[in-house]
Structure formats: structure tokens, C-alpha cells
Amino acid sequence: MKILLNKGGGNIENPGVISLWLGNFKSKEVLQKYVEIQFDEQGDRIPSQFMRDFQIDFINYNEDLLEITFIDISTTSLQLLLEGASYYEKIISQFIDYYGEHMLESYNTVIRVYDFEYNEANAVENKHLVYAGAVIYEEWEE
């Protein structure tokens, strides 16, 4: 299998696909705050900083399908970064096939959004995260 690179159109809800970001944060608390969705006085959702940074809206994004990992010591090892992820066995081989067992840089943070295919054309320069791609974790019959 290969990394899906959505280069056209917008971000899309895509059952069976996981989009992955790698990065570095000071602490798990800072990471949690970065992905946390707030509510205004009327109860309307306010996009998280993560959503704003990567131009993700609520139409195709379900925050219940987001997983984060923070490890204390940065690593280049994809196995260590993805350890404990849902569907680990399905996704690790695809990312290793694409990147190799080690990334070129060290990271301590992983953000995974399931059933969501990020449009790489929306990728922006970000001091905390890089978009690593999307892979299929579960086949769906139409």
C-alpha cells in the first residue's frame, strides 16, 4: 500500500483512512490544549488551534476520531511514535514502506485523525507539526 496524498479538492471525510501529523510539543498538556475544541457563550464550537493551523473545518472532521500521542523523549523511530495507536498493525507497515523505519527528524508528538483525508495542498508552515500523509487502515465496501 502507499501513502495517500490528497492534492486536489478539499479535506474529505473518508471512512477507513487515517491522516497523520508528526511534531514536537513541550508537554502533553500543551498538546491537549492545542487540539481541544472550545465552546462560546452560545454553546457553538470554536475550532482548535490545530484545526485553524491546518485549515480543517467541522464539516469533514469529527473530534471523537482524533488520537494524540506524546512521548517524553523525541525519537526518529516510527514504531515508537505509532506504538499504541488504534489499527497499529495496519498503519505502521504503510508508513515504514514510505518513510523507512526512521524519520529524518526526531519527534515527540503524533496526531492521528481517523476517517479523514487531509488535503496536502492545505498544508501550511507550522512550527509544531508536519503532515506525514494518510493511509488506509480499514477497507470499506461501497
Predicted features along the sequence, with ranges:
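Short, extreme N-terminal segment that most often corresponds to the first beta-strand
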Residues: 2-40
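Low-complexity intrinsically disordered segments
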Residues: 43-142
